[in-house]
Amino acid sequence: MNHIQEAFLNTLKVERNFSEHTLKSYQDDLIQFNQFLEQEHLQLKTFEYRDARNYLSYLYSNHLKRTSVSRKISTLRTFYEYWMTLDENIINPFVQLVHPKKEKYLPQFFYEEEMEALFKTVEEDTSKNLRDRVILELLYATGIRVSELVNIKKQDIDFYANGVTVLGKGSKERFVPFGAYCRQSIENYLEHFKPIQSCNHDFLILNMKGEAITERGVRYVLNDIVKRTAGVSEIHPHKLRHTFATHLLNQGADLRTVQSLLGHVNLSTTGKYTHVSNQQLRKVYLNAHPRAKKENEI
């Protein structure tokens, strides 16, 4: 990559607080774009709309999903927007390109009994389970992103208010409450997890060596929990975020509150979590519709 692209990625990291996972996606998108430029003997600075359309066709020829193509085009559009702030002679060749529509999907989530099974796996008070349990509790109890989790400092935990302050996208702070189970797991972790008692930094979630855990480390921990849990086959940090939102909405939380807890700027982003289980739909219907039950069933 050239120095402009490297500066762009650094800006996303420092000023927009992008997670390492998101930054890696942006970097991969730029690398693939550079390979196309080299293959077609094109220059970054003279790349134009016609070339952008050819690149779109190139992406589809690689049998990529529409969501992947959409993200890659969005990356390049954002990159050129950044470059335009540095050089007034630069024109964004992707600004007029029709964005491929994303496939609609329902976010995956765990049912409550599946969450109980996961927590049961880490209930024994071993040193590793103390750490694993606090990761699981915080992600499920607060719905925070894994990038927010790994940056929590001990001083960000407020035991008086029972909540945590996290730094979200765009470096925006928000306070998220947690419940009694999560509080108990944090207290046990701080009191009995030996690496945190001897470390020389303030990060809350550590690996077994006493270093601040990485996003990859969190994914490894979650995958390990799943391997030890019968009846649960797949997990990723965002699935716990989906679960947090789904369970709140299923129990009657309003969309605006969930939006605030998740740190979403737009309500439409939160709206994708309004899917509910068939059981919950039937429960609401039976309680709300005048002719859902016969008189002898009431």
UniProtKB/Swiss-Prot annotation:
Family: Belongs to the 'phage' integrase family. XerC subfamily.
GO CC, one annotated term: cytoplasm
Gene Ontology molecular functions: DNA binding; tyrosine-based site-specific recombinase activity
Assembly and interaction partners: Forms a cyclic heterotetrameric complex composed of two molecules of XerC and two molecules of XerD.
Lineage: Bacteria, Bacillati, Bacillota, Bacilli, Bacillales
Record keywords, A-Z: Cell cycle, Cell division, Chromosome partition, Cytoplasm, DNA integration, DNA recombination, DNA-binding
Tyr recombinase domain: residues covered: 105-286
GO-annotated biological processes: cell division; chromosome segregation; DNA transposition
Catalytic center residues: R145, K169, H238, R241, H264, Y273
Record flagged with keyword Phosphoprotein: no
Name of the protein: Tyrosine recombinase XerC
SUPFAM superfamilies recorded: DNA breaking-rejoining enzymes (SSF56349)
Functional note: Site-specific tyrosine recombinase, which acts by catalyzing the cutting and rejoining of the recombining DNA molecules. The XerC-XerD complex is essential to convert dimers of the bacterial chromosome into monomers to permit their segregation at cell division. It also contributes to the segregational stability of plasmids.
Predominant location category: cytoplasm
Chain ranges of the Core-binding (CB) domain: 1-84
NCBIfam families in UniProt: PRK00283.1, recomb_XerA_Arch, recomb_XerC
Domain of life: Bacteria
Subcellular location: Cytoplasm
Cytoplasm among keywords: yes
